[in-house]
Amino acid sequence: MGDVAPEVEISQYTKDKASCTRISIESYYSKRVTQCAERENRLKKLEEDMSARGLSDDEKDEKRKIHHSKETDYLRLKRTRLTVNDFESLKVIGRGAFGEVRLVQKHDTGHIYAMKILRKSEMVEKEQTAHVRAERDILSEADCDWVVKMYYSFQDYSNLYLVMEFLPGGDMMTLLIKKDTLTEEATQFYVAEAALAIQFIHNLGFIHRDIKPDNLLLDARGHVKLSDFGLCTGLKKFHRTDHYRNWPVTLPPDFISKPFESKRKAETWKRNRRAYAYSTVGTPDYIAPEVFQPNGYTKSCDWWSLGVIMYEMLIGYPPFCSELPQETYRKVINWQQTLVFPSDVPISIEAKATIKRFCCEAERRLGNHGGLDEIKQCPFFRRIDWNHIRERPPPIRVTVKSIDDTSNFDDFPDEDLSWPTSTLIRPEEQPGRRGEFVDFTYKRFDGLTQKMRYSDLKKQAKKNKKGQGSSD
């Protein structure tokens, strides 16, 4: 017998590279099939639209030529490598545990976007790669007025970038902090729009799992759009059951009887609210009790969260709020005892009944069996024109002076607007070297057809300002 060749030990780096290559190849061919189907669907949609409008053959030919030109431009765009140098950083409009959000302008088109910048090292270390991957995948799949649009996603050695439509109206959290409470009419409107957004996500086959005011964004007219889809995977650490496993669930004897005037409670909540929004720990205020349990949960957990938001709109703070997340958790688990309505903030019987139907056992919950159709039958929403709600003016007017107006966002003064440096890292030390961020790049087709140009509008605004100054 001949000598047996010694086994060659394969390094972890080589194994990671092989795994990454396999993922890349699978992703490449899967994407080619998807892109072909999307291209056919766009042409089919164009043909249906032209037939519905009764266009002549010559007009149809002209439309087809324009469409073909757009498809060619899109292919060219897809081959172009995007970097942060393609954008001008205008202002920081948000900050979180893993990065920040900036208002940016794309150099070649002048379009305005909100760019989310996430540090790869933080995402890997905090086990958040599934979070950002879920958000990227769902935003690329969703194409609806109820969901914030993502136009581009790309990466460099150090960071991930999600380039989304900028919604100048801010978010529901900011609106609720500004207002003590909302009227029942306003609450009906915003809860109805949020319900339509949630139903759209459910129709895609996803559970959002993180419905809260921070994730209900407002467009320039004040209509709701849903954002932040990372928890659709159910993998975010502080929303997993094991994070709360060692927390006590029983209430102390005087827990409910402690007097706490509503105004003072609302002030305390508002004071702590923003800190919770920017922390890695978060708050369990809006999470359904079954999410904490080992028996699992269904899409009805999103309807519970909507009920909590409805309570906050009418009362001024969520029903289970406490100074410590541990206390909030105990209140949520013991909701049968802690879901109470303060006597000093009166609301209608219908409103109270609707909240109780949202915040109850999962099997009895409003929306659990019939989804949006079941919610539409609720007496509290009888004045809502569900089919035309997005065409109606919102009950609270959003003031937006220009497409780059950030007055509805928090101020982050004296921030460094230079782009994060992306230093070259040895391949074996790169975050995501095992393929976590393979195929992260995305470019949206209708990004080619946006109309607004930031530079032109700014020039016009300056001209108008000069004209007004000379006439005074």
UniProtKB/Swiss-Prot annotation:
Functional note: Acts with sax-2 to restrict the growth of both primary and secondary neurites. Regulates mechanosensory tiling by controlling the termination point of sensory dendrites.
Subcellular location: Cytoplasm; Nucleus
UniProt GO cellular component terms: cytoplasm; nucleus
PROSITE patterns the record matches: AGC_KINASE_CTER, PROTEIN_KINASE_ATP, PROTEIN_KINASE_DOM, PROTEIN_KINASE_ST
Protein kinase domain residues: 87-381
Gene Ontology BP terms: intracellular signal transduction; nervous system development
Superkingdom assignment: Eukaryota
Keywords assigned by UniProt, alphabetized: ATP-binding, Cytoplasm, Developmental protein, Kinase, Magnesium, Metal-binding, Neurogenesis, Nucleotide-binding, Nucleus, Phosphoprotein, Serine/threonine-protein kinase, Transferase
CDD domains, per database record: MobB_NDR-like (cd21775), STKc_NDR_like (cd05599)
Name listed for the protein in its UniProt record: Serine/threonine-protein kinase sax-1
Keyword Kinase in annotation: yes
SUPFAM superfamilies recorded: Protein kinase-like (PK-like)
Entry binding sites for ATP: 93-101, 116
E.C. number: 2.7.11.1
Catalytic-site annotation from UniProt: 210
Species, as recorded: Caenorhabditis briggsae
One Pfam family in the UniProt entry: Pkinase_C
